[in-house]
């Protein structure tokens, strides 16, 4: 397990987009930074970075300010600067194919239509980084996907969204240790979602 990890939250930088489902990746890294006393966010690598330590490993949190479709243009210079292999990189992102509040971690795989992941794959030259898939649910039909991901979380979503972000922050040290299964289990226990 590398001693330095880059955790990227995927989202869009416009203030008016902050509460959209597509921005749950930003929300997750914000929760981690706040819970674990990371440094204040600062401008770097066409994004915002915050630094801290979890489980004895240095973590760089990154929020690309490039818009979702160009996320790789922020992630690539950060990985090059720190000389990071793909396995040291994780992308926290919204996942249509998981029920709201469910979390799955995997390494590699396809972009599944997610433009942020597609941009990272292209700019990093490999899909072999980690993905922390944060379930937002599927609207039911392909035609409604665009409006769903770019829509704000509904009031009813708050009952699972807040606890989920708290649980991700709470379990983050397990992820830093490379214990993806334990990270997922801890979140499921904390949110009562198996």
Swiss-Prot record:
Organismal lineage: Bacteria, Pseudomonadati, Pseudomonadota, Alphaproteobacteria, Acetobacterales
Organism of provenance: Granulibacter bethesdensis (strain ATCC BAA-1260 / CGDNIH1)
Catalytic activity: an N-acyl-L-alpha-aminoacyl-tRNA + H2O = an N-acyl-L-amino acid + a tRNA + H(+)
Site (Discriminates between blocked and unblocked aminoacyl-tRNA): 12
Pfam family, one: Pept_tRNA_hydro
Entry-linked InterPro entries: Pept_tRNA_hydro, Pept_tRNA_hydro_CS, Pept_tRNA_hydro_sf
Subcellular location: Cytoplasm
EC number assigned by the record: 3.1.1.29
Keyword Transferase carried by entry: no
Family under the similarity heading: Belongs to the PTH family.
GO molecular function: peptidyl-tRNA hydrolase activity; tRNA binding
Subunit and partners: Monomer.
Keywords: Cytoplasm, Hydrolase, RNA-binding, tRNA-binding
Task of the protein: Hydrolyzes ribosome-free peptidyl-tRNAs (with 1 or more amino acids incorporated), which drop off the ribosome during protein synthesis, or as a result of ribosome stalling. Catalyzes the release of premature peptidyl moieties from peptidyl-tRNA molecules trapped in stalled 50S ribosomal subunits, and thus maintains levels of free tRNAs and 50S ribosomes.
PROSITE patterns the record matches: PEPT_TRNA_HYDROL_2
The protein, known as: Peptidyl-tRNA hydrolase
Source taxon at top rank: Bacteria
Any single GO CC term annotated in Swiss-Prot or TrEMBL for this entry: cytoplasm
Principal cellular location given in the protein's record: cytoplasm
Keyword Hydrolase annotated: yes
Gene3D superfamilies: Peptidyl-tRNA hydrolase (3.40.50.1470)
The protein's enzyme class: hydrolase
Annotated tRNA binding sites: 67, 69, 115
Biological process according to GO: protein quality control for misfolded or incompletely synthesized proteins; rescue of stalled ribosome
Catalytic residues, chain numbering: 22 (proton acceptor)
């Amino acid at each position: 397990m590398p001693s330095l990890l880059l955790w990227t939250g995927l989202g869009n930088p416009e203030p008016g987009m902050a509460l959209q489902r597509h921005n749950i990746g930003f929300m997750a890294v914000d929760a981690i930074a706040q819970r674990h006393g990371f440094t204040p966010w600062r401008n770097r690598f066409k994004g915002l970075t915050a630094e801290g330590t979890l489980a004895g490993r240095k973590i760089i949190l990154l929020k690309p300010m490039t818009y979702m479709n160009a996320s790789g243009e922020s992630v690539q210079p950060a990985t090059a600067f720190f000389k990071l292999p793909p396995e040291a990189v994780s992308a926290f992102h919204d996942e249509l194919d998981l029920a709201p509040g469910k979390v799955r971690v995997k390494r590699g795989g396809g972009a599944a239509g997610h433009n942020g992941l597609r941009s990272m794959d292209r700019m990093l030259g490999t899909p072999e980084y980690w993905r922390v898939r944060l379930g937002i649910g599927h609207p039911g039909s392909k035609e409604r996907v665009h409006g769903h991901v770019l829509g704000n979380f509904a009031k009813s979503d708050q009952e699972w969204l807040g606890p989920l972000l708290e649980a991700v922050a709470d379990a983050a040290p397990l992820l830093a240790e490379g214990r993806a299964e334990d990270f997922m289990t801890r979140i499921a226990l904390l949110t009562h979602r198996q």
